[in-house]
Amino acid sequence: MKKILFCLIAVCLTACSLKTSGGTILDGGNNYEIFYEANGGGLVTEKPTSLFLQFGATMKKKKGESCFMAASDVDTLLKNLRAKEVFKESGECFDNVYYFSPLISDYVIVNGQKVNLHVAFGAENGQAKVATPINFGGY
């Protein structure tokens, strides 16, 4: 009986741990992509399952994530992540803003500064592309 009770408690604790630690940190987005480290050192992207978005459980080494979200929702995300602007750059039809959040563990060095959150404005339909640590590929 003690073994069964112990196993039940262990399963419950594991489930609670997954629920509180996992999922995406980019809440409120759509069209998610997850970046994983490939065997050769490059990056592989995958569309996450709904279970991943809820719990975040994976056996792969996650290197980052991205999604699209309404530009009007970005401020709420930045506030929730306690992100501070590091620098920004603009072009003819885009604005890139780079942030650092103490709540995101991984970061990259850009222009000698730590960056772990990248917001690219300029998409159609009032959408922004948000990524950790930066947007990979084209936008």
Indicate residue ranges for each PLM-predicted region.
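Positively charged n-region of N-terminal signal peptides that target proteins for export
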Residues: M1-I4
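Hydrophobic h-region of N-terminal signal peptides that target proteins for export
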Residues: I9-S17
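N-terminal export/targeting and maturation segments
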Residues: C16-S66
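A structural detector for beta-sheet-dominated domains
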Residues: D27, F35-E37, F100, G122, ...
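Short, surface-exposed beta-strand/loop "edge" segments at domain boundaries and coil↔beta transitions
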Residues: G40-T45, T76, S105-I109, F136-Y139
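Generic recognition of long tandem-repeat/solenoid scaffolds
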Residues: V44-T45, N96-F100, V130
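Mature extracytoplasmic domains of secretory-pathway proteins
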Residues: F52-V110
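A cross-kingdom marker for long, charged
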Residues: V110-Y139
